[in-house]
Amino acid sequence: MVNELNVKEKMPTSGSVKKVVIFLHGYGADGADLFSLSDPLSEQLPDCFFASPDAPRKCGASPFGYEWFPIPDIDGSTIPDMMQALASSEKLIIKLIDGYKKRFGLDYSDIVLLGFSQGCMISLNIGLRQLNNLGGVVGILSLIHI
């Protein structure tokens, strides 16, 4: 199991952290994929810290990218493999959130998850089922089973 995430970070242009946005990339990508959004967003959100982790697992279908969990229909993994990896990734993301909360003296309501595709799936799962007091979840192009 991976214990830490490789994270790209950008401090706020104001120098004062009042909010955090965590980007969660899609299947087969990496943290750099969404991190480029931090430049235009920082102009509108000068007190916002941006973070973009790589998912913890190398992607079975894309040798240069990462995955939050395997997809059985794509890589031949099993549903239990997928669920175990999903739970493990969620724990790592919650650990990351808690770390920023402590580091910057923030509340959960000051932290937003922005996820694309598979990153959206895990963002919605965390935001709706585990940490429903987050500042928000922005989901782009995904789904969730309720």
Predicted regions and their residues:
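Active-site signature of alpha/beta-hydrolase-fold catalytic machinery across serine-
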Residues: S36, N125-R129
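Proline-centered flexible-loop/turn and helix-kink motifs
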Residues: P46, L131-N132
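Residue-level signal for alpha-helix termini/capping positions
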Residues: G105, L128-L131
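Short beta-strand immediately N-terminal to the catalytic nucleophile in serine-hydrolase-like folds
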Residues: L113-G115, I140
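Gly/Ala-rich beta-loop-alpha elbow adjacent to hydrolase catalytic centers
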Residues: G115-G119, S123
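A conserved short beta-strand
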Residues: N132-S142
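Conserved small/polar residues in nucleotide/adenosyl-binding loops
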Residues: I144-I146
